[in-house]
Amino acid sequence: MFMGEYKHNMDSKGRIIIPAKFRSELGDKFVATRGLDHCLFVYPMHEWSKLEKKLTSLPITSKNARTFVRFFFSGATECEFDKQGRISIPSNLREYAELQKEVVIIGLANRIELWSSKRWGGYLDSAEESYEEIAAAMEDLGI
């Protein structure tokens, strides 16, 4: 399971070191794609396969489903680690997530997310303000 928050610097070639705890969970090959809130989602292959099955079973007659699936899959790329434990993030994904030098890597149970440090800070500030309201809504869902 992925959890925690780490900050690492991305080099000029778009490579970033993934924390050792996350590397062992991700395995040899994994998938990175556009996420929500202008971050990147990174899935181990077994989680990607489950998600792929769910998304490809959505009705193509649904405009929202088509739009989401196109956006999600067209940005997806299979990744692997180099000898230094780094991944190379393609330029289109770096641009989407506005990744600069400092990148925040967070663990979210079945995936990791890569955030620009600036965007993550802004997200935390806004989420903190509504955290209690969100917690109450989660309670209404039985969580």
Swiss-Prot record:
It holds the Pfam family MraZ. Gene3D superfamilies: Transcriptional regulator MraZ domain (3.40.1550.20). Keywords: Cytoplasm, DNA-binding, Repeat, Transcription, Transcription regulation. SUPFAM superfamilies: AbrB/MazE/MraZ-like. GO terms for cellular component: cytoplasm; nucleoid. It comes from the Bacteria. Residues 5-47, 76-119 form the SpoVT-AbrB domain. The keyword Transcription regulation applies. NCBIfam families: division/cell wall cluster transcriptional repressor MraZ (TIGR00242). Forms oligomers. This is Transcriptional regulator MraZ. It comes from Halothermothrix orenii (strain H 168 / OCM 544 / DSM 9562). The gene is mraZ.
